[in-house]
């Protein structure tokens, strides 16, 4: 009897503690239950444009002392890539080790793919560069699981990640869509370890050369006495979710659903390929049913007509259920961000389509920081007020005539493979 009362008391206490949690605290607890690790993240900076991102990255490259690790879906053979490669060559001459991974399919799909000749010259300079999983006929099954990462790591101390590849169109746009909007996040501290471990895992899968013997972010960068002498940095908690086919195939769907299900007041999402289906769509509907305010931003113009028509149908469904849908007009918004209750956010590589959620290698940082979240919200509100159109039934009727609706319904049949 006493044992039963004790167990009942523990259950009641646990319920009371959970009742007092906010959405961020519940999400962290759910992430730990999911098997994710919570890391300290320091010196977080949102890089809201390509100009700021590449300038910041180039400065970090110049300061590198040991190694530079780059893992990108696309390395386009153009001017910004040329500038980066020349800087990397100089660092190799200074004794810094440089390794690059790029996706083979992403390269072939590029406007200006890296040529074999340029790759050979890069290797001759001392930079190790490898293509992830080359697509060779007839093994077309390799098309399904692509390396969609966008990661740069400097000395195991700093990581850059987000939606940007290495390509000129992030700076100058494309004729079809105009400006190409995107953003990155830069972080320091123990959270870099998660990205470096992911890089070496990908390198081991891709490259024949051995892993390095030198230290990584998993080891202290300074002694205890040196740490005491360093300026104190503000740190927050963060988690890193990495989709790896065959090992963690559902992790992106699970983390997004957890965040949305825990939202109490506000869900804000910017995503370029929001061909919603399954668990994520159901989570958004549940949030709306709970009275949570949902604000979703997509682009009027994107780099695919198929995407636009399917996304239009999904956005109409959300609008009819009470969501605020904003169409970004000033180019193509390629960012992949989400903010929950002004308390925490995610920045990463994941699109809300089948490729990212069910097939590709992806990685997202979940940052439990109101300050960082507010920075993203300010960008969101600025875009909403100055560069967006609120979707209404009248706007939808005007933008989606019958031919687009029919086309969208036909394409929706195959959206689990788009």
Predicted regions and their residues:
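Intrinsic disorder/low-complexity segments enriched in polar/small residues
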Residues: 4-5, 22
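Charged, low-complexity intrinsically disordered terminal segments
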Residues: 15-418
């Amino acid at each position: 009897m006493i044992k039963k009362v004790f167990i009942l008391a523990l259950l009641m206490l646990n319920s009371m503690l959970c009742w007092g949690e906010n959405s961020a605290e519940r999400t962290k607890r759910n992430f730990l239950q999911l098997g994710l690790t919570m890391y300290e993240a320091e010196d977080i900076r949102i890089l809201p444009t390509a100009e700021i991102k590449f300038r910041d990255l180039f400065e970090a490259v110049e300061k590198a002392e040991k190694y530079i690790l780059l893992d990108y879906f696309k390395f386009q053979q153009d001017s910004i890539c040329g500038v980066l490669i020349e800087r990397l060559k100089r660092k190799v001459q200074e004794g810094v080790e440089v390794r690059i991974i790029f996706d083979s399919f992403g390269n072939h799909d590029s406007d200006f793919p890296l040529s074999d000749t340029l790759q050979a010259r890069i290797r001759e300079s001392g930079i190790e560069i490898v293509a992830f999983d080359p697509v060779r006929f007839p093994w077309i099954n390799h098309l399904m699981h692509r390396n969609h990462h966008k990661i740069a790591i400097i000395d195991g101390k700093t990581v850059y990640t987000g939606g940007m590849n290495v390509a000129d169109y992030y700076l100058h746009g494309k004729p079809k869509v105009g400006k190409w909007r995107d953003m990155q996040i830069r972080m320091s501290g123990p959270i870099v370890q998660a990205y470096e471990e992911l890089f070496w895992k990908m390198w081991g899968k891709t490259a024949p050369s051995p892993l390095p013997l030198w230290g990584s972010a998993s080891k202290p960068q300074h002694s205890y006495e040196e740490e005491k002498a360093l300026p104190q940095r503000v740190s927050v908690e963060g988690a890193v979710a990495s989709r790896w086919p065959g090992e963690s195939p559902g992790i992106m769907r699970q983390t997004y659903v957890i965040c949305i299900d825990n939202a109490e007041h506000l869900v804000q999402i910017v995503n370029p390929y929001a061909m919603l289906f399954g668990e994520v769509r159901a989570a958004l509907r549940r949030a709306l049913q709970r009275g949570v305010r949902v604000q979703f931003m997509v682009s009027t113009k994107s780099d695919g007509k198929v995407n636009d028509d399917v996304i239009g149908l999904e956005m109409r469904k959300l609008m009819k259920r009470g969501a605020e849908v904003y169409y970004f007009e000033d180019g193509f918004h390629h960012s992949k961000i989400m903010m929950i209750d002004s308390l925490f956010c995610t920045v990463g590589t994941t699109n809300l389509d089948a490729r990212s959620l069910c097939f590709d290698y992806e990685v997202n940082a979940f940052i439990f920081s109101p300050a960082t979240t507010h920075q993203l919200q300010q960008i969101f509100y600025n875009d909403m007020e100055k560069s967006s159109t609120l979707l209404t039934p009248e706007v939808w009727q005007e933008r989606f005539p019958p031919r687009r609706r029919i086309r969208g319904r036909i394409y929706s049949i195959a959206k689990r493979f788009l």
